[in-house]
Amino acid sequence: MSVLADAETLRQIAIFRNCDTVPLQIMAFTAERQEFSIGEDLMTQGKKARAAYVLLNGRVSLRENDQDVGVAEPGAFLGETAMIGAGPYSITATARDIVSTARISHELFLKVAKEYPDFGQAVLNNLSEKLYNSVRELDTIRVMLDKSRKFSDL
């Protein structure tokens, strides 16, 4: 893929929404291309997160606590929290096909965010919005569970 196509792929990812083109092109150009064989892990739950991956080609099985939780397809962004901070991966991602990725390390993201502060702020805003929406969804589920408990007491 070309840098322009890869930058457009990045733009389709929610945390890069509303970001300027130039920092996305820089990330697309400098991201390390990695290929994974069938059955090879891109990331392993509990291991130190070192990078995020944009899935360019192929499919990836996703597991959490040894249970299948889904399949990622091209355009998926895996391990986004690794890009912005340290910590362990929350899932295991295993190649189902031969997989091509663009690997975005924490260091790469920080360099681009330092050079383009508006880019870093836009990503932070998008992540904050995602976190807010996740908390709202959890609150909705909590209310539903509370109601179901009250109903079961009848």
Residue ranges and their predicted role:
Residues 1-154:
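Cytosolic regulatory regions built on CNB/CRP/Popeye-like sensor folds
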